[in-house]
């Protein structure tokens, strides 16, 4: 909200956040008379939504999916002032400048009733409560736009003048989106003034979605945007629909390639780069019948949408998208991306693309590979297999690695095909874009690079052995066979292959059975000295990106290399005491000791204890793991065979480390001019340091470290000049986080 609007409605508060443990995760929160609402973006489980079930009772629900709704989105007669972008090359990086637009958001009386009196639980139909619902929606949308496009939306200072509480007296035709385009333009211009806003929109409960294309900053059409659903609340409304319709106003076209269901008649040829319904914001996820790739949109823009929107908002000519925003330097630098070389591969064969990026700010990056192809006509995703131009592969939400396998690994391992993951069966060129995001709240940095994959009539390249379940002994010999199918000839020229083995069902392939053997269709190998019931073989081209995995699990069974008879863990102060005993050992190199702490996401290696090789005598081992923090720690053993072959894992033991608590408080609170006292109580002597963080989790001030004795100590606190407001503080003792709190700084 603009400062003057926020001042009139102090009960409505919005927040932006970023995870300290995983900076790729960003958050938007709001606290209003209707409760707490939250959105997490970039989490390991995808988008997470937090919404009140009964705010008065403090009951909230979190979930990862949006609710579906019947939907119709249309564009009026073209208002585009410049050609749409269909560039397959590298897009211009951005993120160093934040573009802020003044949003005039109106509503019909029906919308006001829907989000108040007809809500669950019901609240009074007042401007405060309606504005609260609007703020929740725009806080979600601007959180996405800031991260994806470096665009911020701010509700204008007198936006409450556009809130209508009665359907009988509002100036809108609630169920007619086309009519409301002109009605909203006229009303916002009259009530607010043409020069006092940059983009206008109206919420309703009918009429679907409709918006003028390339409307932002254009005095003739900038308020022509409508979003209306019978239930205009929840993340399905905010992300799938509001962000979508505003995307049109910022210059984004539809990205789906389907022509069935609601997709029929709404496809845009130049930007139809997503198979089926598509999954990104400017697609039609869940409303294209048999071509639905998934039920709801993911909260990010396809690369072609970023191209279109950024092209429009950087055009500073009169009535174009760059003519009216406020430009603010963010200090951020966009990632620099490398997509890798182009390759030629056989048709009908899986492949993997790998790229990378660097970030001058050291931000945690996420990556998304997307196909950048479009055909003259739309069609079913499966039909793209025989097309030389249609998009084959869907978009997936950005992940922490620059590697993507086509089709997705789960399809390969299960021998199934899903919508939007189709291998080509003809010779063609596939164009791909790797986009890297730094996910910074307040203006995300985005960079990209492109590459191409060419398929030929050769192929498919397929493993022809172990395609049904088999059982072998560890260290046994086995002949792997595969169909070469002209992959040694030009232009593929794959003279050699690498043969790998997996023990986890094909998720990873740590065992090299043949590093560089001729691509002649047959090779004898020796299985590793491991036991597994979920083994898989992978044959991949050396110096190329294509491969195949056999279709069924391979079982390797035989005597265990180590018989573990006892494994215990106990606490002694801040040390974990580990003891274990073996009955026999066969080719045992030793034990990797792995630990997982209270704040760890996975186990990590902390020590290695050498084994006894081969022996039939009982052996005892012990290890002390010192300097553990408070909390429950988990420990396991990873036995390794001689030669570096991985063996088996032990059971997991837990140790509860109890450390006397550290207490601290800053007073007075509020703190005038950064001057006050911090009282610290330590169980033992240590070096303490206080760091101040802003609401985005960025450190803004740090006190010099102080050596303190055990017990309670009052330490003068002097913080450098920082703006007044609410801050988080954290106390570290001997370099470890000990406690934290909040402090309000006054001028």
Model-derived features: positions:
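N-terminal prosegments of processed precursors
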Residues: 1-52, 179
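Fold-level signature of zinc-dependent metallopeptidase catalytic domains
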Residues: 59-216
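The catalytic-center signature of Zn2+-dependent metalloproteases
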Residues: 156-179, 218-299, 370, 374-380
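Extracellular acidic, Ser/Thr/Pro-rich low-complexity tracts
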Residues: 345, 356-361, 438, 483-490, ...
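Recognizes extended acidic, P/S/T-rich segments that occur
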Residues: 381-418, 423, 511-515, 590-630
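Short, surface-exposed loop/turn motifs with a glycine/proline- and acidic-biased composition
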Residues: 610-634, 704-736
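C-terminal tail/sorting-segment detector
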Residues: 642-660, 678, 702, 716, ...
